[in-house]
Regions:
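N-terminal Rossmann-like NAD(P) cofactor-binding subdomain of oxidoreductases
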Residues: 1-88
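C-terminal substrate-binding/catalytic lobe of Rossmann-fold NAD(P)-dependent oxidoreductases
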Residues: 58-61, 66-188
Length: 188
C-alpha cells in the first residue's frame, strides 16, 4: 500500500491467499485486512444460495452453471483469441461456453464446500444480469416445499437484504438494478 492508499478491495477472485469475503457467506469474518477480494459477481450470486442450502440441509456435492452476460473481455465482432478460439467470438450474438472460477472460489468463502462444487459458464448476448443454475445433492431428504421455505425464511431473516425470492415470474431484464446479491426463483 503506497501513496496514501489504506485499503484495497478488488472484485475478482484472488489467485493467491488474499482474504476473500462475500456478503451472505463469510463477510462477518472480516477483521480489518488491508487488502481483500470480494470474489466475482458469480460467486456473490452463488454463495448466499449455497450457504442457505448447506446450513439448512447440508450439501454433499454440487454443479453450478453460470449463464453470464457478456463481459468487456469479449469482442463485439469475431476476433482472434490467444488461448480459446471461442472467447474470440462476438459476445453480442453468440452463446460462448467457457470456464468459471466461482466453483473454486466458493470454498474460500464457504470452506465446508471445499472439493464439493464444480462449475462451468456460458456467456450470453445480454448486456447485464447473470443467472446461476445450481444443482446439488443434499445430505437430507427434502421436498421442493422444504427448499422454498428455507429460502423464504433466509430472505426474511439471516439473509434479508442479500437474498430474495421471486414469485413473479420475472426475466433477466427485470433484474437490472437489483440490489440483492441473489434472487431465487420459487417456481422452478
Amino acid at each position: 500500500l503506497e501513496n496514501g492508499v489504506k485499503k484495497v478491495l478488488f472484485s475478482a477472485p484472488a489467485k493467491d491467499d488474499t482474504a476473500t469475503f462475500v456478503i451472505g457467506a463469510n463477510a462477518d469474518e472480516y477483521a480489518g485486512e488491508a487488502i481483500v477480494s470480494n470474489a466475482s459477481c458469480t460467486t456473490n450470486g452463488l454463495a448466499p444460495v449455497a450457504k442457505v442450502l448447506d446450513d439448512v440441509f447440508g450439501i454433499e456435492k454440487g454443479l453450478m452453471t453460470t449463464i453470464h452476460s457478456y463481459t468487456s473481455s469479449q469482442p463485439i465482432l469475431d476476433a482472434k483469441h490467444k488461448k480459446d478460439p471461442r472467447k474470440g467470438r462476438s459476445g453480442a450474438v453468440n452463446l460462448v461456453p467457457t470456464t468459471t472460477g466461482a466453483a473454486k472460489a466458493i470454498s474460500k468463502v464457504l470452506p465446508s464446500l471445499a472439493g464439493k462444487m464444480n462449475g462451468q459458464a456460458i456467456r450470453v448476448p445480454t448486456p447485464d444480469v447473470s443467472m446461476v443454475d445450481l444443482t446439488v445433492t443434499l445430505n437430507a431428504s427434502v421436498t421442493v416445499e422444504d427448499v422454498q421455505a428455507a429460502f423464504k425464511t433466509a430472505s426474511e431473516g439471516s439473509h434479508k437484504g442479500i437474498l430474495g425470492v421471486d414469485e413473479e415470474y420475472r426475466v433477466s431484464q427485470d433484474f437490472v438494478g437489483e440490489e440483492l446479491s441473489a434472487v431465487v426463483a420459487q417456481d422452478t
